[in-house]
Structure formats: structure tokens, C-alpha cells
């Protein structure tokens, strides 16, 4: 008898205690427990997985924007829903223009809030450049720059894009949405959501009003702020679009409805249906032309 040994691993370094995996789980096996974090009583949410409910499908692994959950089967990374093409992957579209990148700049490396970026600089002979400032202008011009990003952990916040020189890095968010702060309900000087946010510049406390403000430019709509907020309806999160690889799956349709809304799920279904109809028409036209 062949025994399958499954192992789920949560990397606490990358887990931001958001709600994505919990919402996407078809078995409702993932819950978020509240614990006291420190003396200031800032809440810290801890993920708990009910192994009796979990069927080890791997959806939590592939849907996590931060790549914090890993599923292994018999010691190897094996995800059944990917193998069967019954669930999509998040698209992490990151472009790097090495020609436009200043030779002596490390801004993107320093700016990444999750320390996912490393830059390597090599001279004409392919040797690592340790101190570019000691090189002549001619030597600098021949330096090749490589941008290394741990893409599986990148939530596409775009901080690197805006901190870097124009045109060097382009990042397309894989989740779009909107966060609304009800300032009447938001307690003055409360920083629960600010402390929970994994992207420091996405949500912040105003120096003037002492109330929370959101910078949608860098927000990844993970929901960590919503989970941490102690006041009901003080912070509202709406995900409107999730960019993913192609799939035709009932499991994804249900997950999309929970992650965004029923309207968005229906909209995507209609778009897929329209695209499929166009493909069928194109094939028929091509078939008719071949017959002629």
C-alpha cells in the first residue's frame, strides 16, 4: 500500500496574518486566532489549520501573496490542484530595465519592505564588483547589473518601482481593490492596522488628525489591516480584481467570490464565456476556410 505523507509549513517570516488563505480554503480549515502581542495590547493574529478538515489540496500554498505556506507530499513540493489545472496561480509581473538602471544605485534593494531584492553587479569579465565607486567611468559603463527578486514571496506592492529611477522597474499588482476608512468610527491614535500592515507606506497615521490614512499606490489588499482592526466597520476592504493564470475551475469561482464578491465572480465567468465563444467562432471560420 502506497502511503502519502503530507506536510504543511508556515513560514512566520513571510506570514503577515492576513485573510487570503482563510477565505480561499474550500474546506474552511484555516482560521485566524487572536492573541495579545505585547504590553501595548496590539493584536497579533495567528493562523491555525484544522487538519481534520484539510484535504491538502494546496490552494493555500498557491494563493498566498507572500508565499508563506508550503505544501509538500512525500518530501516534494506537489500541489494537486496545479497538476490538474483546477486552480490558478497569482501572476507576479515584474520587469527590469538594466540599461536604465544607474550603476551606483541600490535604492530598490533598500526600499523593499520584505527584503526580497538583491542586486549583483559584474564587470566585463563577469567578476562581482565589490565597490563600484573605486572604478573609473569607463569601467562603470561596462558593468552589468542583475536584479534578483524572490518572486514567490513578492506581493507586488510597487514600492521598489517608485523608489527607483523612472523606467527601471515596472510592477503590475496582482490584486486590485479599495480600502475605505470610516473616520467617525476609527479611534483616534489607534495603530492596530498600521502595525499589522506588511507594507510600511501603505497605511499610516496622520500627524495632524491622528487618524489612519491609506496610500492605495502601495496597498496589496491582503486584508491584514482588516483582520487587526478592533472596531467593526471602521475599515472596509473591497478586492475588485485578481490577476491569475488561466483556469476553468469551479473551485476558483467559489474562492473568487469569497475573496472579492459574487458580482466579480459572475463578471469573470461571463468574460471567460465570451472569450470561449470567440475562440469557437474563430476555429469554425478557420475550419471553413480550410475546407474551401
Label for each model-derived stretch:
Residues 1-6, 13, 40-292:
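Flanking helices and flexible, charged tails adjoining ferredoxin-like Fe-S electron-transfer domains
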Residues 4-7, 13-36:
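The feature marks the first
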Amino acid at each position: 500500500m502506497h502511503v502519502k505523507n503530507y506536510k504543511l509549513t508556515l513560514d512566520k517570516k513571510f506570514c503577515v496574518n492576513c485573510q487570503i488563505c482563510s477565505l480561499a480554503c474550500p474546506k474552511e480549515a484555516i482560521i485566524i486566532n487572536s492573541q495579545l502581542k505585547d504590553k501595548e495590547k496590539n493584536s497579533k493574529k495567528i493562523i491555525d489549520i484544522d487538519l481534520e478538515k484539510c484535504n491538502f489540496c494546496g490552494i493555500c500554498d498557491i494563493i498566498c501573496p507572500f508565499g508563506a505556506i508550503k505544501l509538500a507530499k512525500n518530501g516534494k513540493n506537489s500541489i494537486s490542484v496545479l497538476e490538474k489545472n483546477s486552480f490558478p496561480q497569482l501572476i507576479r509581473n515584474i520587469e527590469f530595465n538594466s540599461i536604465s538602471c544607474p550603476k551606483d544605485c541600490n535604492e530598490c534593494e533598500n526600499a523593499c519592505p520584505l527584503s526580497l531584492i538583491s542586486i549583483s553587479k559584474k564587470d566585463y569579465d563577469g567578476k562581482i564588483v565589490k565597490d563600484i565607486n573605486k572604478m573609473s567611468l569607463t569601467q562603470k559603463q561596462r558593468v552589468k547589473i542583475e536584479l534578483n527578486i524572490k518572486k514567490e514571496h513578492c506581493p507586488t506592492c510597487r514600492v521598489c518601482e517608485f523608489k527607483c529611477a523612472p523606467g527601471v522597474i515596472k510592477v503590475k499588482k496582482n490584486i486590485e481593490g479599495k480600502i475605505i476608512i470610516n473616520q467617525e468610527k476609527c479611534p483616534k491614535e489607534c495603530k492596530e492596522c498600521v502595525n499589522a500592515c506588511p507594507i510600511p507606506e501603505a497605511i499610516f497615521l496622520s500627524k495632524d488628525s491622528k487618524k489612519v490614512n491609506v496610500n492605495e499606490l502601495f496597498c496589496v489588499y491582503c486584508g491584514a489591516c482588516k483582520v487587526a482592526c478592533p472596531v467593526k466597520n471602521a475599515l472596509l476592504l473591497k478586492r475588485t480584481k485578481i490577476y491569475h493564470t488561466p483556469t476553468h475551475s469551479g473551485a476558483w469561482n467559489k474562492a473568487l467570490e469569497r475573496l472579492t464578491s459574487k458580482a466579480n465572480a459572475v463578471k469573470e465567468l461571463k468574460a471567460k464565456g465570451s472569450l470561449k465563444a470567440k475562440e469557437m467562432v474563430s476555429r469554425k471560420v478557420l475550419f471553413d476556410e480550410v475546407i474551401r
